[in-house]
């Protein structure tokens, strides 16, 4: 069958943190309900276990888009930020059927095999005119043609992503003022910087055995570790994704950005530089001690820090999710 392409995960995705997320974090994710109907309509038969999970994978999405652009000369994008996660254990059983029941036109399935190194399964792929069998070892990615059904046989855990053809993404910004602070999980927000009087920032909050705040503010890098009390506040319900709606634009129409007040963000936190580190304080959350590489710009840091506090207090659909962490891209006026 023409059009079936298999890649090693490490060769396709050039981002170490996202690769580790794919390899290690998906089996811990809780099921999500507010999901695009096209994802829900992936029919999973047999005795396999399955779940619908959040799958914010921007580097994987870009890599698949590049491959499909070279094949079809068209751009593709994810139908949904969610994915189907299935676990198959059927060495000697009838192949487990996995296919899109309604077969929407021009859907491109992408299958990622995760789990143990020794896991291997076969994809039995069929269309109206041909069929093929592809072996999929652990940490391999199969990009399938449009309008196919497939069955699986063997042992594996698979992530099923759905893509379709798209035009260029609409701009995230329409009108802004200098008192706006704008955040989104989409990196392309940084490409829409209104002027040189604005700066970019990136925030990642991870909470596992300890809580870590990682910020890049106008090129300066900060790595902050929370004290025990602050860690307890941040880690509470860190995996709660149950209230997140999809943003597929066919079933759910959530805004892709949030606009915050710059003055509130500027006054919503404090930071102080000493000879050892930057001490950061978020009211009602706690304190962080941070290392720093780059120029110390207290106002910019306070704005980004207050955005981090906003994320801790309000865990909704705006930030991207990556295992035990969440992240946003942001812009604000200097």
UniProtKB/Swiss-Prot annotation:
What's the family? Belongs to the orthopoxvirus OPG181 family.
Q: What's the protein called, per UniProt?
A: Protein OPG181
What InterPro entries does the database record attribute to this sequence? Poxvirus_A51
Expression induction per the record is:
Expressed in the early phase of the viral replicative cycle.
Origin species, per record, is: Vaccinia virus (strain Copenhagen)
Q: Pfam families annotated for this entry? A: Pox_A51
Keywords tagged on the record: Early protein
């Amino acid at each position: 069958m023409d059009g079936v392409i298999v890649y090693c995960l490490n060769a396709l995705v050039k981002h170490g943190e996202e690769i580790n997320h794919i390899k290690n974090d998906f089996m811990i994710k809780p099921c999500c309900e507010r999901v695009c109907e096209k994802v829900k309509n992936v029919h999973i038969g047999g005795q396999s276990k399955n779940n619908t999970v959040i799958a914010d994978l921007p580097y994987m999405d870009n890599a698949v888009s590049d491959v499909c652009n070279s094949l079809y000369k068209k751009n593709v994008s994810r139908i949904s930020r969610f994915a189907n996660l299935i676990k198959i254990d059927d060495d000697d059983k009838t192949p487990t059927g996995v296919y899109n029941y309604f077969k929407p036109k021009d859907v491109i399935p992408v299958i990622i095999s995760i789990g143990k190194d020794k896991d291997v399964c076969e994809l039995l792929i069929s269309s109206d005119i041909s069929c093929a069998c592809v072996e999929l070892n652990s940490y391999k990615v199969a990009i399938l043609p449009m309008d196919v059904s497939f069955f699986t046989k063997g042992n594996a855990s698979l992530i099923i992503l759905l893509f379709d053809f798209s035009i260029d993404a609409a701009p995230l910004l329409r009108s802004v003022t200098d008192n706006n602070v704008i955040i989104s999980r989409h990196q392309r927000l940084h490409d829409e910087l209104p002027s040189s009087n604005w700066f970019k920032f990136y925030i990642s909050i991870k909470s596992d055995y300890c809580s870590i705040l990682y910020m890049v503010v106008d090129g300066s890098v900060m790595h902050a570790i929370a004290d025990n009390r602050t860690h307890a506040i941040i880690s509470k319900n860190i995996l709660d994704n149950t209230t997140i709606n999809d943003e597929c634009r066919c079933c759910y129409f959530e805004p892709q950005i949030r606009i915050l007040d710059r003055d509130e963000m500027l006054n919503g936190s404090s930071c102080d530089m000493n000879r050892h580190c930057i001490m950061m304080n978020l009211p009602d959350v706690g304190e962080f001690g941070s290392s720093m590489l780059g120029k110390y710009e207290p106002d910019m840091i306070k704005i980004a820090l207050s955005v981090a506090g906003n994320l801790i207090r309000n865990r909704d659909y705006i930030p991207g999710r990556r295992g035990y962490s969440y992240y946003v891209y942001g812009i604000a006026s200097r």
